[in-house]
Amino acid sequence: MAQGSDNNDTSYTKSPSPGNKQGSSDDMRKVMRREKNRIAAQKSRMRQTQKADSLHLESESLEKENAALRKEVKRLTEEAKYLSTVLSNHEPLCTGLSGASPELLYGAHHGAFHQHISVPHYPL
């Protein structure tokens, strides 16, 4: 890039003639406007960086929560399979109750063929 072609370079601005108060006032306004714009741009970049940092932290938190929920789904799926197996193994022992209502099948029954089965507790 050629030297002096930068629009923000103030060394190439025209200096007003000593008697021209209007030109001096315009230059001051231009300098003030540029300074305000520079500060506003800096604040905008800071807000953008803070927002990106915040979104990054939220993303990490959601990924951890997602992993915990997937772990819980896996545990509950394994528990459901286990309980299904326990039920399948227990149903043949309840031969006198075939065709009975669900309350009798799955309620507390104390028949001669009832087998007590301990259910494992999975850690969270």
Curated annotation (Swiss-Prot):
Region described as Leucine-zipper: spans on this chain: 55-83
Short name of one Pfam family: bZIP_1
Keyword Metal-binding: no
Listed Polar residues bias regions: 1-23
Alphabetized Gene3D superfamilies for the sequence: 1.20.5.170
Annotated ranges, domain bZIP: 27-90
Subcellular location(s) per record: Nucleus; Cytoplasm
Main localization category: nucleus
Keywords assigned: Activator, Cytoplasm, Differentiation, DNA-binding, Nucleus, Repressor, Transcription, Transcription regulation
Alphabetized SMART domains for the sequence: BRLZ (SM00338)
Region described as Disordered: 1-60
Alphabetical GO biological process terms: defense response to protozoan; DNA damage response; DNA damage response, signal transduction by p53 class mediator; hematopoietic stem cell differentiation; isotype switching; lymphoid progenitor cell differentiation; myeloid dendritic cell differentiation; positive regulation of cytokine production
GO cellular component: cytoplasm; nucleus
Basic motif: region residues: 29-51
GO function terms (MF aspect): DNA-binding transcription factor activity; DNA-binding transcription factor activity, RNA polymerase II-specific; RNA polymerase II cis-regulatory region sequence-specific DNA binding; sequence-specific DNA binding
Family under the similarity heading: Belongs to the bZIP family.
Task of the protein: AP-1 family transcription factor that controls the differentiation of lineage-specific cells in the immune system: specifically mediates the differentiation of T-helper 17 cells (Th17), follicular T-helper cells (TfH), CD8(+) dendritic cells and class-switch recombination (CSR) in B-cells.
Record's protein name: Basic leucine zipper transcriptional factor ATF-like
Organism of this sequence: Danio rerio (Zebrafish)
Lineage, highest ranks first: Eukaryota, Metazoa, Chordata, Craniata, Vertebrata
